[in-house]
Amino acid sequence: MKKIAVITGASSGMGKRFAETVDRYGTFDEVWVIARHEAQLEALRATVPFSVRVLALDLTDRGSFDVYAAALAETPVEVGLLMNCSGYGKFSAVLDTPLAVNLNMTDLNCQAVVAMCQITAPYMPRGSQIINIASVAAFQPIPYIDIYGATKAFVLSFSRALNRELKSRGIGVMAVCPFWTKTAFFDRAIKSDETPIVKKYAAMYDPDNIVARTWRDAKRGKDVCKYGFVARVQAGLTKLLPHSVVMDVWMKQQDLH
């Protein structure tokens, strides 16, 4: 029986960082990396010291889940780790964003997470773990990042509930809620031909520090991982203040009306 790890969104950003360092978490016979861009996944495979299987799949296409399910079924495997890192956001008013983009975002950020968890969990033995990338945006509504924030709130809530459901099977689930992080996320989130909506960042963290904290908290069996003083303060304040006040502060900080 081959022991594997499965990582989505592995072609760039946080997903790539996790794929490059997964051997810090544990030892696997093979690491399956999933993303749309096959060339980038192949480049990743050439740089890591462990066996990698490339699955070039678009997780907004529901047919991709059939391909993934078939790949699991055709080879005797146990999945020791599932990491759902696929996702993106847009800094834009809802009505200024094409409907297709907003629906695609919800498909990738939410439906793909549900599908990957449900398909993979039957192959996960006791002691295995699911890690879903959420965001500190999950803790409050954020105007002009509406869809992204709402999808990450879904991921956080889903992950915590699933963690409780799978406890009897010995499978842990953790949601990672980072603050602003220096990745390619911003290349897709910001329209290059317009004045950025988000102008001020309270902090910007190094992705390597997020990765290290994630591996540490996963080994400790936590259900939520938050890195950085600012992230913890923001998450804490959303429990104390009305969300209307939190949104007012955000709008004022970004000079929005």
Feature locations, PLM:
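Conserved NAD(P)H cofactor-binding loop of Rossmann-fold oxidoreductase domains
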Residues: C85-K90
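Substrate-binding pocket helix/loop in short-chain dehydrogenase/reductase
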Residues: A93-L95, V101-N104
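Residue(s) in the substrate-gating loop at a strand-loop-helix junction
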Residues: S135
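C-terminal helical subdomain
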Residues: A175, I197-R232
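Conserved glycine-rich Rossmann-like NAD(P)H-binding loop of the short-chain dehydrogenase/reductase
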Residues: G26-A43
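Conserved glycine-rich cofactor-binding loop
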Residues: S11-S12
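Active-site helix of classical SDR
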Residues: C117, T151
